[in-house]
């Protein structure tokens, strides 16, 4: 559920976008200007929502990010332009949208941009002093990062299911194939619409994908069956966006094939959950252990390490990741499997 605009942190105003090409600004169906209440990075905030640099539903052009998606009112194309053009150079984001879902897209945009993400408790001196030095330093350098909340359950769940127990490369390759094959062209924003921008399939469209197309995409029967099971309850699934993140994650796991890892990955993106941890991730536990103690660990060890910061554990992980830290590598890498010719 999208909160009333007046209830969202930061400030907003209807606007005509001076920084955008005049014909583009004039042609927008709905537009808005949002002022974050502090430092802000559009690319670092929305980065976790992209399924790689070739995500068919996104296009990044410098300080501008385009995104095409489905709303309850229909498809929309949204253009998000980051600038420092507010009073005294304060950051702002210019928001424009086109298509039947333009109004819904703009109303949801502040939450998408992280307007509801409150770091006050994390930054409170007594709490901050308990954090490892690398996390403290990372936070100092990443004050502009927010946790985004897309509110779009199906759009996040499908690609995350495809990433279960396979490499990111093969999962994203399959996702791109299916979105291009079964998605729809993004609503046009005049001559400026990025070429090839696609709205990912709706739940109904995903349910029409035949078994041989999943196979051609390199998606095995276990993962495709999980997608189909989940999307047969798409209406109930979308309602989870209105629930608290941890409750939504628990309810999601009632669906066979959706476990703790999938649920955590989803609510991190749909709800901007500051605490959910991707237990069961192939790399995360070893990565966190190496970063915090110099030694690899397992899921139980990772949870024990992060327990002092419960309520903000995902923030801690994001800060570690923002440092560029790399754990020492030992043993074989996970092999990309290609079963499309079998």
Q: In which residue ranges do the predicted regions lie?
A:
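HhH-family (HhH-GPD) DNA N-glycosylase catalytic core used in base-excision repair
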Residues: 2-342
């Amino acid at each position: 559920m999208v909160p009333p605009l007046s209830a969202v942190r930061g400030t907003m105003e209807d606007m005509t976008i001076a920084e955008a090409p005049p014909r583009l600004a004039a042609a927008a169906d709905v537009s808005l200007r949002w002022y974050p209440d502090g430092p802000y990075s559009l690319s670092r905030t929305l980065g976790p929502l992209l399924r790689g640099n070739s995500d068919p539903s996104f296009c990044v052009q410098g300080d501008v990010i385009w995104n095409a998606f489905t709303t309850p009112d229909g498809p929309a194309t949204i253009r998000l332009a980051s600038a420092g053009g507010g009073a005294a150079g304060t950051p702002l984001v210019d928001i424009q949208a086109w298509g039947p879902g333009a109004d819904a897209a703009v109303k949801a945009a502040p939450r998408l941009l992280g307007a509801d993400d409150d770091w006050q408790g994390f930054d409170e001196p007594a709490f901050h002093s308990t954090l490892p030095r690398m996390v403290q330093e990372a936070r100092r350098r990443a004050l502009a990062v927010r946790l985004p909340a897309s509110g779009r359950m199906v759009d996040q769940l499908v690609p995350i299911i495809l990433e279960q127990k396979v490499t990111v490369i093969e999962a994203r390759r399959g996702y791109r194939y299916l979105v291009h094959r079964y998605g729809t062209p993004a609503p046009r924003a005049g001559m400026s619409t990025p070429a090839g921008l696609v709205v990912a399939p709706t739940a109904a469209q995903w349910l029409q994908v035949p078994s041989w197309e999943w196979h051609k995409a390199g998606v095995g029967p276990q993962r495709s069956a999980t997608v189909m099971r989940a999307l047969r309850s798409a209406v109930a699934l979308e309602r989870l966006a209105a629930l608290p993140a941890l409750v939504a994650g628990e309810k999601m796991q009632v669906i066979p094939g959706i476990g703790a890892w999938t649920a955590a990955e989803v609510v991190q993106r749909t709800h901007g959950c500051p605490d959910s941890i991707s237990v069961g991730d192939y790399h995360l536990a070893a990565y966190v252990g190496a970063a915090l103690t110099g030694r690899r660990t397992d899921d139980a060890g990772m949870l024990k390490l992060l327990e002092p910061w419960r309520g903000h554990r995902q923030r801690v992980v994001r800060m570690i990741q923002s440092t560029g830290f790399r754990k020492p590598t030992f043993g074989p890498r996970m092999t990309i499997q290609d079963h499309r010719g079998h």
